[in-house]
């Protein structure tokens, strides 16, 4: 399913179904049979248990899902966000954290950027960039190692979202780009999300007030967030 199609389905479920139906056992059963299928054991109670998971627990879940529920979709980014990322890069050294199947890293590498990517699960191939297996909460790089750091559709999966954001900031030299889904918090969903940002103002407590950086937000179907360091 393309990201644009998924956005329409999520919007329909979140905004037009009454909450009593949206959180009902009926919807759970439909998702089990038509969306989750063989991977239901990993996702049925994920949101209920999500903040008890360790990094190793999450790594195991995502590795199993990559086998049990392989996706034909090359990226979770919609095309508008991809275009905005390409126009927003600073410098030549790029880090993508939560690179998934490697679509964006390959695209940036093909445009002449020096790209490093980090994820729990290794991609099938890394033809034009360096891959490092690891966690957003513990990045194996020196401070200010990359001109631009990109983290798309990842922080919503991380229990310690503030710690992860601090780690992304640590390795950023100039610009940090973060993409987050615009989604309401319900028990049953199409994904393994822990954090939800249905409104733009809910992003501000996450990013906070910082004296040495400036932050901007755009609604591009998903939230497109840019934080620039001020020297």
Segments from the language model and where they lie:
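Local beta-strand N-terminus motif with an aromatic residue
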Residues: 91, 146-147, 173
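Short catalytic micro-motifs in class I SAM-dependent methyltransferases
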Residues: 153-157
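A short helix->loop->beta-strand "cap" motif at the edges of active sites that frequently abuts
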Residues: 112-113, 172-174
């Amino acid at each position: 399913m393309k990201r644009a199609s998924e956005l329409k389905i999520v919007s329909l479920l979140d905004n037009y179904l009454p909450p009593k139906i949206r959180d009902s056992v009926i919807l759970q059963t439909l998702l089990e049979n038509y969306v989750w299928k063989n991977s239901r054991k990993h996702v049925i109670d994920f949101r209920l248990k999500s903040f008890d998971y360790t990094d190793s627990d999450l790594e195991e879940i995502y590795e199993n899902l990559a086998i049990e529920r392989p996706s034909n979709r090359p990226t979770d980014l919609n095309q508008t966000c991809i275009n905005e990322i390409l126009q927003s890069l600073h410098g030549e050294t790029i880090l993508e954290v939560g690179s998934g199947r490697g679509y964006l890293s390959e695209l940036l590498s093909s445009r002449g950027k020096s790209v490093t990517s980090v994820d729990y699960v290794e991609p099938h191939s890394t033809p034009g960039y360096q891959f490092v297996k690891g966690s957003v909460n513990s990045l194996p790089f020196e401070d200010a190692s990359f001109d631009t750091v990109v983290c798309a559709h990842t922080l919503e999966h991380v229990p310690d979202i503030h710690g992860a954001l601090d780690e992304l900031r640590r390795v950023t030299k100039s610009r940090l780009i973060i993409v987050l889904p615009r989604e309401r918090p319900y028990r049953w969903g199409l994904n393994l999300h822990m954090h939800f940002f249905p409104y733009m103002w809910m992003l501000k407590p996450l990013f906070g007030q910082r004296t040495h950086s400036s932050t901007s937000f755009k609604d591009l179907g998903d939230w497109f967030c840019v934080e620039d360091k001020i020297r």
